[in-house]
UniProtKB/Swiss-Prot annotation:
Gene3D superfamilies: Ribosomal protein L31. InterPro entries: Ribosomal_bL28/bL31-like_sf, Ribosomal_bL31, Ribosomal_bL31_B, Ribosomal_bL31_sf. It holds the Pfam family Ribosomal_L31. One of its GO terms (biological process) is translation. PANTHER family: 50S RIBOSOMAL PROTEIN L31, CHLOROPLASTIC, LARGE RIBOSOMAL SUBUNIT PROTEIN BL31C. Part of the 50S ribosomal subunit. Signal peptide: none annotated. This is Large ribosomal subunit protein bL31B. Belongs to the bacterial ribosomal protein bL31 family. Type B subfamily. It comes from Bifidobacterium longum subsp. infantis (strain ATCC 15697 / DSM 20088 / JCM 1222 / NCTC 11817 / S12). Keywords: Ribonucleoprotein, Ribosomal protein. GO terms for molecular function: structural constituent of ribosome.
Length: 85
């Protein structure tokens, strides 16, 4: 690998808001950690925290449940515009 062209890669905690689950993994978002909130993890270390709406904990493909996640009222807007009358 060439020196100096790859982004910084390190541990980050992701929080799935819809499933209320936290998980620690590695990400290139650690380079933007200055702008991110932090969280004290179970191992005693502090990591950057990234909020996500969908992860493997809440995605219908992984959970086997058909759930409509509508964060901004988009389904209602669509039904109002194009729904059956």
């Amino acid at each position: 690998m060439q020196e100096g062209i790859h982004p910084e890669y390190g541990p980050v905690v992701f929080y799935d808001r819809s499933a209320d689950k936290y998980f620690l993994t590695k990400s290139t978002l650690v380079a933007k950690a200055v702008n991110l909130p932090t969280i004290d993890w179970e191992d005693g270390n502090t990591y950057p925290l990234v909020n996500v709406e969908v992860s493997s904990y809440s995605h219908p493909f992984y959970t086997g449940k058909n759930v409509v996640i509508d964060a901004a009222g988009q389904v209602q807007k669509f039904n109002a515009r194009y729904g059956r009358k």
